[in-house]
Curated annotation (Swiss-Prot):
Identification of the protein by name: Actin-related protein 8
Predominant cellular place of this UniProt entry's protein: nucleus
Tissue specificity remark: Ubiquitously expressed in all organs and cell types. Higher expression in seedlings.
Organism expressing this protein natively: Arabidopsis thaliana (Mouse-ear cress)
Keywords (A to Z) from UniProt: ATP-binding, Cytoplasm, Nucleotide-binding, Nucleus
Start and end residues of each F-box domain: 40-86
Length: 471
């Protein structure tokens, strides 16, 4: 009866047109071995690869049922190769699932788990991921906030934090309470029904005792507000670290072009290395928008609001690989803005992003982006934290203005020219993997882990106990 159902499932799945070969990624999976006492009956004559291919055409629940019939089928049905295939067929990208389950599974401090070590059963991982409760992810910064369910492909809501709530990086209880209550209302959820994953804003950057106390105060205020709202468990992770996870890395340098400032953070094994040095540039996305506004006014281009200018920045602006050469080109382009009509920009398109590399164009005395990243890399190299210097040679960009086309290529070229070859060799600059939602997607990786909430979350009881011990 089971085999009849198996072949019915095989027939239905084979007619769906799925290309099984395309799902077999370059991953080493130990071969399945059957003991001499095990038997698959009439299937004993089939090669193991064929048996696995047959099971791949079945639904996961049918594969589990088949594994209950005898030890031999259990050996085939529980193999990692089969369940890796099922995970590859899920909505989440397989590369992200594999990174999360091997690099983030242990919680913090991170411990890499090899797929070859025997510690990982992808059958159990598949089962556990299906049972992970849905979480609410809130990625809030000084400029904008994104929020939504962990099971969704992208955030379901956004808000202008600075306009609606003021400075949420200042740990004022009433302001944070209004911030979280508004999000829960818009999502139409009760705070007590699911865990919350929240990104910690990038602020108080130094390694001083004062900065540490300020960061601790903000984190404590966030926990107090959420637990007073009866949230069962909270996971709070640094915004830059989440962006790094979204790029499937646990070590590297994150460049966050924030609303008001640009921060360059070295991160090793998921920890911000403040003792090495966090670089801060005193302007951010707001300055880029303001610079474009000034250029438009100089050219008598009228607009209704700063939101219009921001829209034009997002849709038309880019970073030139060679600024001087770009000046002699025809770069005119037009775009329609809803409710305002068509706008045409020319040199403003690349002059806006150029102030990242030449702040003096905007009348600012500040470090350029490549100078700040180079300085951070110099500090990482001098610190000698690991025997391998490759950990800081991956640069991940994040933030809305970091999505400007051409920025990653230009920064990579500038770093190659600015740094000695001993450091510049092997440098790679990665654009925001998920655009403006990069940190949100890093949180999504954590919230969909098979062991979540597990080691990543703190419960209300644990927080209260820890607070009593501190005081």
């Amino acid at each position: 009866m089971i085999l009849k159902k198996v072949w019915g499932s095989v027939w239905n799945r084979s007619n769906s047109g799925k290309d099984l070969v395309n799902h077999q990624r370059a991953i080493d999976v130990p071969p399945l071995l059957l003991s001499s006492s095990s038997s698959l009956g009439a299937f004993d004559q089939l090669p193991m690869d064929i048996l696995v291919q047959i099971l791949m055409m079945m639904e996961p629940k049918d594969a589990v049922k088949l594994g209950l019939t005898c030890k031999a089928w259990k050996c085939v049905a529980s193999g990692n190769r089969l369940w890796i295939f099922y995970l590859q067929c899920s909505q989440e990208p397989w590369d992200s699932i594999f990174f999360a389950e091997t690099s983030l599974r242990s919680g913090y401090p991170l411990r890499m788990i090899s797929s070859q070590s025997g510690e990982l059963s992808f059958m159990h991982i598949y089962s556990q991921r299906a049972q992970v409760p849905g979480s609410i992810i809130i990625d809030g910064g000084s400029g904008y906030c994104k929020f939504g369910w962990s099971k969704y492909a992208s955030p379901s809501g956004r808000s202008a934090t600075f306009l609606e709530f003021g400075n949420i990086e200042s740990p004022i209880y009433a302001r944070l309470q209004q911030f979280f209550a508004t999000i829960f209302t818009r999502m139409q959820v009760k705070p007590s029904m699911q865990p919350i994953v929240v990104s910690l804003p990038l602020c108080h950057f130094d390694d001083t005792e004062s900065a540490k106390a300020s960061r601790r105060q903000l984190k404590t205020a966030i926990f107090n507000v959420l637990f007073d709202m009866n949230v069962p468990a909270v996971c709070a992770v640094n915004q830059a670290v989440l962006a790094l996870y979204a790029a499937r890395r646990t070590s590297g340098i994150v460049v966050n072009i924030g609303f008001q400032v640009i921060t360059i953070l070295p991160i090793l094994h998921g920890k911000v290395m403040r003792q090495v040095g966090v670089e801060v540039i005193g302007f951010g996305a707001l300055k880029l928008t303001g610079f474009l506004k000034e250029k438009m006014q100089e050219n008598n281009i009228s607009f209704q609001s700063l939101y219009t200018v921001r829209t034009l920045k997002e849709k038309l602006c880019y970073v030139a690989l060679d600024y001087k050469a770009e000046l002699s080109k025809d770069t005119q382009a037009s775009v329609e803005v809803s409710g305002e009509g068509w706008f045409t920009l020319s040199k403003e398109r690349f002059q806006t992003g150029e102030i990242l590399f030449q702040p003096r164009l905007a009348g600012m005395r500040a470090m350029s982006l490549h100078q700040a990243v180079s300085l951070c890399m110099d500090h990482c190299d001098a610190a000698g934290l690991t025997g391998d210097d490759s950990w800081f040679k991956t640069v991940v960009l994040t933030g809305g203005s970091a999505c400007l086309p051409g920025l990653s290529e230009r920064l990579e070229r500038e770093l190659q020219d600015h740094l000695p070859s001993s450091i510049s060799n092997g440098i790679r600059v990665i654009p925001p993997p998920y655009g403006v939602d990069t940190s949100w997607h890093g949180a999504k990786l954590i919230s969909n882990l098979s062991i979540f909430p597990g080691p990543w979350c703190i419960t209300r009881k644990q927080f209260r106990r820890k607070s009593r011990l501190m005081w």
